[in-house]
Amino acid sequence: EELYIKVKSGTSIKEIKEELDKKNQQLAFEPNDFGFLFEGESNEGTIGGVLSINFAGPRRFKVGSARDHILGFKGVNGKGEIIKSGGTVVKNVTGYDLSKIITGSFGTLSVFTEISVKVLPKADLTKTLIVENPHLKKGLEYLNIALGSSTDPSGGVFYPEYFRSQFVFNDLTTEGPITAIRIEGSKLSVDERINQLLKELNVS
């Protein structure tokens, strides 16, 4: 099965995620969802907007930015000319990769009309290790250790106490700052890596 999608630039991230979920696939660069911050619907932004600003989420340090996942596009430049670049395979460009130049240009070089993007299979299991109530220095120390660890986390964040009122963390009811570190992979692998990470962080 081909690991790419070809979509119109105005397609919402929500719609793309719903279709990819059916095939157990994902946008690996994981664009953040800020809809709830602006009292909007979740993931109502478009794939064209995401690529125009080269927007990526927590998995960026592992898999790269949105720019690293675009395979090709069609668009319109400032002269009204239709342009296209790339295709639907990874090695499809010689010389300048126009797709990567346009991505992140905020629409100043071209406006996307159609985009081909690489997708990846979802992990079998995802778990998030949460360390409660670290002060800022300790929380950042945990992140530094974890993100450089052989446990290969796919995301990490420190939430200060004043952020906690803005988010719901499943069944976590305690207050105070937290450090969260995400591990993905097969069930056996994830459990082993979580245990190893607990030892490396010296927490229980």
What is the predicted function of each stretch?
Residues 1-204:
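Noncatalytic alpha-helical scaffold of FAD-dependent oxidoreductases
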